[in-house]
Swiss-Prot record:
The modification Phosphoserine is found at residues 115, 469, 668, 742, 895. Signal peptide: none annotated. InterPro entries: SMG8-like (IPR019354). Residues 95-110 have a biased composition (Low complexity). This is Nonsense-mediated mRNA decay factor SMG8. Residues 685-706 have a biased composition (Polar residues). Involved in nonsense-mediated decay (NMD) of mRNAs containing premature stop codons. Is recruited by release factors to stalled ribosomes together with SMG1 and SMG9 (forming the SMG1C protein kinase complex) and, in the SMG1C complex, is required to mediate the recruitment of SMG1 to the ribosome:SURF complex and to suppress SMG1 kinase activity until the ribosome:SURF complex locates the exon junction complex (EJC). Acts as a regulator of kinase activity. Residues 16-41, 82-127, 279-299, 653-722 are annotated as: Disordered.
Length: 991
């Protein structure tokens, strides 16, 4: 054979001239078919098969194929990558009887010649799924002179293939285009080790001698578990391999043991400058001490042999009977060879010295070599003129004048074992009292090709998907047996699993610590985060994510199995205390014994509240729905207290069908500010005109009208005409659109500025009640109702000036000249202001903003954040300040509890005493129960004209709910003025 070839190409070419089916059944990548090749002349030669595997260093020329160059004393493999620019790589060519001649073998990492399984058209296997790409390459070279067939394995342990795998991981090819996380990346590398073990199993099944190459001078202990894994895998798949070669023309013992003999394993270590022998410091260089019998390299060799043998005996990789072992080592021969390192560590300097030596050839030498050399002769001349040795370049033996035993060369080391094979003596490596002879067979080239092809089909090149064929079935069974390797190879995962399994109970304890019997999702997540912190402190390795997911599942199962608290929150932001339950249906009774139980929500929180008019108080449960909060509680008290009082009812939904449907949760957004400004510019308001919306507009008949909330702050201020001190009744502007409320769909919540158009709720959350005539309120004693803190039950006076004109001033125009003997009206009124005005020019109303806390304590406020406190016979402060300001919806209660948590009181009622006078008091409540973008809530009838001579009570909603959920009361450290009743709640209009 003139050059190295891919083992797959070699077996394909041999199968062609043997008349059997090709392993892959496809032409070679080199471009020609193997079927046309003649029979090689060495087909009947008895051959010795030597397999080479191991790791390579990062240094130049440390690849394993340099070893074959040294042993064969010729340039079989190229010294450097891409030596010839037009080299197509190893392929099969029929020239001078060669089965596979290569013009120059390419680097093992390249894809030419069937280099990588699953990466090219011709591959060493067909496992091409994402993450299972095999980076192992088997190359073959037959030396006809020495009758030795070299099989060279380049795998993930070599730099070129390792670099390809790392690039695949980095680019995402191994993960289907995505970057793999730690656990999947670890699984990728372990899978590559398993595929490498299949290639090693093949070498251990077809070779007589195996060379393990290592780039350092210390033994890698990980080979111990690799060999134990291979031994276990071989015992597992041995029946399958027997089936594969049962028809091959080999001996009975070969068919029985699936190998020509127990292979002998030899070790090659590289020094790489690590071993340096220097004379002692005090020794005279002229009179050195007597040298020892063995050189330092020989002593290192013996030490490594003893260490390796002891390790393999302890782990029972080597036993007394060699026939039962994966491999053997000789008892009376050297099986470790130390390859000396180069004196020149700098690869660039080494190349420059090589170039310089070739450029300075002497004349006598040029006569000996008259023409340019190439091929093997060129390699020998390079060796003779080389000043520096390559990594595997070994000098010939020579005598030593110092008396030390001379170290043999690499070829001499290997050939003492090869000769035992070629002479058919075999290996007698069994030890002990009763050693059993091991089988041995020296096959011919043709017989070896026959057996090697069958094993190659099922172990490496077989297609697992082809289950219909015997080869595909055997391949499937062999690949399923790879799981045997996990206990040996995946030590990291095994350690990680043990570590994570020990961390799980600690994480479970951290999760269950200080837990109530039932708890919410928020508590579950907090406890799970604490458990994950404890778990991450102790868990390590690739199994971390797997057991973290198991921790998630375990904690969720514990929580959902009888410990799950109802997630529903009341309208006051309190959790339901029941465990997970369902609500009773219409007409169904609660059943606590069912699974899940049928119960109403209950937070076990109770408060005290007053009825619509405020005269009667009663305890109330914490509400969970808007109807119970704003309607049901007050309806129960209505029967006992307020039922006989006069009411102003707000419009509600009146169905026209027996089964009305709630409206969908689609909010009508408020218009932008620019549109609202344009609307104001187009329709200027006259003095005293109402800024509130009529009932038709409040039902959503105009989108622009909904954008006016909150009211324009410029409309307020200190102008008394705006807030009702004196206003002249003018003609109202007409509605934009006349539209009736829907009688098919109802509003499921409360009416607010973002509600859909034309919808009404089924019940009103507001109430307007008349307690009695205006004289029923005593200015000196205040309101006589339950729950008021002493001194806070008074209403504030509101003096409204009624403009009355005398008969002689009726036709007077302020813009015209005054008549003779008539005074200017402005001046006359200024003169008469002090004493001449009549008593009916001023009407006195009374206003009170009542706040109520959860304990039923009530008090009035005379302004924002100012609790009323009357010490004498009535309040002296006017109601103008409160009417001209945004009143807070919540305020700190005047009587705080003992706890640190602040106690809030809520604005619940507005008391208005309307005098019997020629004026109208219009009620326009607007509440914003939260910071923006919280909408503005208002009653179903926005402008309510209060009849004269009455004491009226407007009861505000207890809770505010939108389609997105309830507007909860404020928490600690929250600006209370973000929760407010907008200014302009009352307006007086003179008649």
């Amino acid at each position: 054979m003139a050059g190295p070839v891919s083992l797959r190409d070699l077996l394909m070419g041999a199968s062609a001239w043997m008349g059997s089916e090709s392993p892959g059944g496809s032409p070679t990548e080199g471009g020609g078919s193997a079927a046309g090749g003649p029979e090689p002349p060495w087909r009947e030669d008895e051959i010795c098969v030597v397999g080479i595997f191991g790791k390579t260093a990062l240094r130049l020329n440390s690849e394993k194929f340099s070893l074959v160059n040294t042993v064969c004393d010729r340039q079989v493999f190229p010294l450097f990558r891409h030596q010839d620019p037009g080299d197509p790589g190893p392929g099969i060519r029929t020239e001078a009887g060669a089965v596979g001649e290569a013009g120059g073998a390419e680097d093992p990492g390249a894809a030419a010649g069937g280099s990588v399984r699953g990466s090219g058209a011709v591959a060493e296997g067909n496992r091409t799924e994402a993450g299972s790409q095999d980076y192992s390459l088997l190359q073959a070279y037959y030396s006809q002179e020495s009758k030795v067939l070299y099989l060279l394995l380049t795998s993930i342990c070599d730099n070129s293939q390792l670099l390809r795998a790392c690039r695949a991981l980095q680019s995402g090819e191994a993960g289907g285009g995505l970057s793999l996380p730690h656990a999947e990346a670890h699984e990728f590398w372990k899978h590559q080790e398993k595929l490498q073990c299949l290639s090693l199993l093949y070498l251990f099944s077809v070779c007589h001698i195996l060379l393990l190459v290592h780039p350092t001078c210390s033994f890698d202990i990980t080979y111990d578990r690799v060999f134990r894994a291979l031994d276990g895998l071989r015992q597992k798949v041995l029946p399958l391999l027997k089936t594969a070669i049962k028809d091959c023309p080999v001996g009975k013992d070969w068919k029985l043991n699936c190998r020509p003999c127990p292979p002998r394993l030899l070790f090659l270590f590289q020094l790489n400058g690590a071993l340096k022998v220097e004379p002692p410091r005090n020794q005279d260089p002229a009179h050195p001490d007597k040298p020892k019998k063995h050189s330092p390299k020989r002593r290192l060799q013996h030490a490594l042999e003893d260490q390796i043998y002891r390790i393999f005996r302890k782990s029972r990789v080597l036993t007394n009977q060699s026939i039962n072992c994966l491999f053997t080592v000789p008892a009376n021969q050297a099986f470790v060879y130390i390859v000396p390192g180069s004196q020149e560590e700098d690869p660039v300097g080494m190349l420059l010295d090589q170039l310089r030596s070739h450029c300075t050839v002497k004349d006598p030498e040029s006569l000996l070599v008259p023409a340019p050399l190439s091929g093997p002769r060129r390699y020998q001349v390079m060796r003779q003129h080389s000043r520096q040795q390559l990594s595997f370049h070994i000098d010939s033996s020579s005598s030593s004048s110092s008396g030390q035993l001379v170290d043999f060369t690499l070829r001499e080391f290997l050939w003492q074992h090869v000769e035992l094979v070629l002479s058919k003596k075999g290996f007698d490596d069994s030890v002990g009292r009763n050693p059993q002879p091991s089988h041995f067979e020296l096959p011919t080239y043709q017989k070896w090709i026959s057996a090697a092809s069958k094993l190659y089909e099922v172990a490496i090149d077989g297609k697992e998907e082809d289950l219909g064929s015997p080869t595909g079935e055997l391949t499937s069974k062999i690949l399923s047996s790879i799981k045997v390797l996990e206990g040996f190879l995946d030590i990291d995962t095994k350690f990680s699993e043990n570590r994570c399994q020990k961390a799980l109970p600690m994480a479970h304890s951290a999760y269950q610590s200080n837990l109530p019997h039932n708890y919410t999702m928020t508590v579950h997540k907090n406890q799970l985060a604490q458990a994950l912190r404890v778990y991450s402190q102790h868990a390590r390795g690739p199994a971390f994510h797997k057991y973290a997911m198991q921790l998630h599942e375990d904690c969720y199962k514990f929580w959902s199995n009888g410990h799950q608290l109802c997630e529903e929150r009341s309208l006051t932001d309190q959790h339901c205390v029941h465990k997970f339950h369902s609500l009773p249906k219409s007409g169904e009774k609660p059943e606590a014994d069912r699974n899940p139980p049928v119960l109403y929500h209950n937070s076990r929180a109770r408060s005290t509240g007053a009825c619509n008019c405020g005269r009667k108080q009663a305890p109330r449960d914490d509400p969970f729905d808007i109807k119970a909060a704003n309607y049901d509680f007050y309806q129960l008290l209505e029967e006992k207290c307020c039922g006989k009082l006069d009411h102003i009812n707000f419009p509600v939904f009146e169905p026209s069908t027996p089964d009305p449907a709630p409206a969908k949760n689609e909010s009508s957004p408020a218009p932008p500010d620019s549109d609202a400004d344009k609307l104001k510019e187009k329709e200027p308001q006259t003095q005293g005109e109402s800024t509130s919306l009529s009932l038709a507009l409040s039902l959503g008949q105009s989108t622009d009208s909904l954008g006016t909330y909150p009211a324009d702050p410029q409309a307020g201020g200190d102008n008394p005409e705006v807030h009702g001190q004196v206003e002249v009744k003018t003609e109202k502007r007409p509605n934009f659109v006349d539209r009736q409320a829907s009688t098919v769909e109802y509003l499921p919540g409360m009416l607010h500025s973002n509600c859909p158009k034309g919808l009404l709720p089924k019940f009103s959350s507001w109430s307007l009640v008349k307690l009695g005539p205006a004289k029923s309120y005593n200015f000196h004693t205040g309101l006589d109702q339950q729950g008021f803190i002493p001194g806070t039950n008074y209403l504030m006076p509101w003096d409204i000036v009624i403009r009355t004109r005398a008969e002689d001033e009726g036709d007077l125009d302020t813009n015209s000249w005054p008549a003779p003997n008539k005074a200017i009206p402005g001046k006359r009124s200024a003169v008469v202001m002090g004493r001449g005005r009549r008593r009916d020019d001023i009407a006195r109303a009374f206003v009170g903003f009542e706040y109520e806390d959860s304990r039923g304590r009530r008090f009035m406020c005379s302004g924002p954040d100012k609790v009323m406190k009357v010490m004498g016979s009535g309040p002296k402060e006017s109601a103008l300040k409160a009417l001209n300001s945004d009143m807070p919806l919540y305020i700190l209660s005047s009587s705080q509890g003992r706890g640190l948590k602040p106690h809030y009181a809520q604005l619940m009622r507005l008391f208005v005493v309307v005098p019997d006078a020629p004026l109208q008091i219009i009620l326009m409540p607007q509440v914003q129960p939260g910071p923006p973008p919280c909408p503005v809530f208002y009653p179903e009838k926005q402008e309510i004209t209060l009849p004269p001579d009455g004491l009226w009570v407007l009861r505000f909603p207890y809770a505010y709910v939108t389609e997105r959920g309830p507007c909860f009361p404020p928490k600690e450290n929250v600006q209370l003025m973000s929760y407010k009743v907008l200014r302009g709640v009352l307006k007086a209009v003179t008649q």
